Amino acid sequence: MLGVKIGNIHTYDDWKLILTKVEKSFPEPKTETQEVPGMNGVLDLTESLSDDIKYKNRMLTLTFNMINNRTRWDTLLTEIENYLHGKKMQIILDSDKFYYYEGRCIIDKFSSNKAIGTLVIKCDVSPYKYELDTGGAWLWDTFNFRNSDIYKTKFTIDGTQQITIVNGREITSPTFVCDAPFTIKFGGVVYKIEAGTRKILDIRLQEGNNDFIISGHGNLEIRFRRGML
């Protein structure tokens, strides 16, 4: 039975809630415009303020039916409210199992008749959803062959090697984890890192292919969150 994983709880497996509707709003772009006298339209400064379009949060609205013993509804509602109401949670839809959302959840309303209770949970989530296993091992049971690819992020370098990192829609800075010193060339700029963990904020992974030239001898992992709208 399809449901939603909220934190460590699955809405059907743990609570026997029947998911009847999922509503997802589209995140509104944060635009910046100025009126200029004598100019048609407006001056759009949105992309000039940062290296990517920024978005407001989106809303996930999840509607469930309760069909278990009516005498347990109050007890179950108390359990659900204590577990998630007002809390920031990770949300994974069974229909989109390769990604997770992050946001704050509330119980919006509950109504009932003699046979069925209806529960609405709303989650104010970040605009991007993120791949569950970006930068690490991926699992067959969450892998979606239609919408996802297998991306290599761990490398053994012996000399100089060109590697390609495939990023999603959100522009982001990666973290490098290595067991030896390396020289990294990206976008015409050379960076030198020592063994250990280092996030390089000046490196901005663009959507699609990002090519690096790596020099050194050892193991290198590139970690980042691959965000999709």
Question: Which residues fall in each region the model found?
Answer:
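Polar/acidic, low-complexity leader/linker segments enriched in S/T/G and N/D
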Residues: M1-G38
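Solvent-exposed loop and beta-edge segments used for protein-protein assembly and interaction
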Residues: K54-R58, Y83-H85, N113-A115, G168-E170, ...
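Short, acidic/charged, Gly/Pro-enriched secondary-structure junctions
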Residues: N65-I106
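Short, solvent-exposed beta-alpha or beta-beta edge segments that form flexible loop/patches at the rim
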Residues: K24-L60
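Intrinsically disordered, low-complexity segments enriched in serine, threonine, and glycine
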Residues: L132-L229
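Mixed-charge, glycine-accented linear interaction segment located at domain edges/termini
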Residues: K5-T11, D124-S126, R204-N209
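Short beta-strand and beta-hairpin "edge-sheet" elements
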Residues: P27, Q90-K129
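Oligomerization/assembly interface segments of phage tail-like spikes and tubes
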Residues: L45-R70, A115-K129, N210
